[in-house]
């Protein structure tokens, strides 16, 4: 059961940033396991179990990131990631091109939300076509998002706007990649078991957005 991260979690992430090498990591591996790896896996398991109970008609697929970077893609970085995350999807048959729910912790902050890790150009073109064909479903979702203060629309914009469906949907329409995120500084919630409930509530709020985006990717594959 998740009981919260700790100051030691943040200390480890900062120290790893400045000592990102195998000898240091091996010397501090038990600290990693105790303060980051096991709490992350416990949080992910608790959130997944709660979502399965709350939404029994859905199948949830969990992935917890490993601390080890792909040795083929270091590009001058150290062998270990300086952040850690987990993702949840309702479809295991496709990869990171479909949206996912996520939680991530870094030395600076933590975040959770839902969106694309990356999105193909065809996916976003299909997204724009869906808006053009019927803007009302996304209009309702955009208004719902604007009526709360936990999640915000983020993600890289196209350098040149793809179109203008009106002030409300313009920020959505012109995203190269789309994310609904909540970013917080390290606070009491991070160090509390109440984080589990916060994620479950947040992911529940984001489910209609996930369904909308996931349906877009299915239309693209059709």
Task: Put a short name on every predicted segment.
Residues 1-15, 44, 151-222:
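Long, solvent-exposed, polar/charged low-complexity segments
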Residues 47, 51, 55, 142, ...:
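Long, hydrophobic, amphipathic alpha-helical segments used as structural scaffolds
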Residues 14-67:
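Active-site acidic/histidine clusters and adjacent loop/turn architecture
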Residues 53-80, 84, 149-162:
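A short, surface-exposed loop/turn module that caps and links secondary-structure elements
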Residues 106-164:
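Compact, glycine/acidic-enriched structural inserts
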Residues 29-36, 116, 126-131, 191, ...:
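Short histidine-centered catalytic/ligand-binding loop motif
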């Amino acid at each position: 059961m998740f009981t919260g991260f700790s100051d030691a979690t943040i200390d480890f992430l900062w120290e790893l940033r400045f000592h990102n090498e195998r000898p240091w990591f091996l010397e501090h591996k038990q600290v990693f396991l105790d303060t980051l790896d096991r709490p992350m896996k416990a949080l992910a398991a608790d959130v997944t179990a709660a979502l399965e109970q709350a939404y029994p008609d859905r199948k949830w697929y969990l992935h917890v990131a490993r601390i080890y970077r792909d040795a083929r893609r270091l590009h001058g970085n150290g062998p270990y990631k300086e952040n850690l995350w987990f993702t949840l999807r309702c479809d295991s048959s496709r990869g990171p091109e479909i949206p996912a729910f996520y939680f991530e912790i870094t030395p600076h902050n933590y975040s959770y939300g839902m969106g694309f890790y990356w999105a193909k150009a065809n996916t976003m073109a299909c997204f724009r076509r869906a808006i053009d064909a019927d803007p009302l479903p996304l209009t309702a979702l955009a208004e719902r998002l604007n009526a709360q203060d936990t999640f915000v629309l983020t993600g890289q914009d196209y350098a040149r706007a793809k179109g203008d469906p009106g002030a409300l949907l313009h920020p959505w329409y012109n995203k190269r990649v789309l994310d609904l995120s909540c970013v917080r500084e390290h606070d009491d919630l991070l160090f509390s078991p109440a984080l589990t409930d916060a994620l479950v509530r947040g992911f529940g709020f984001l489910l209609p957005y996930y369904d909308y985006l996931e349906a877009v990717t299915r239309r693209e594959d059709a």
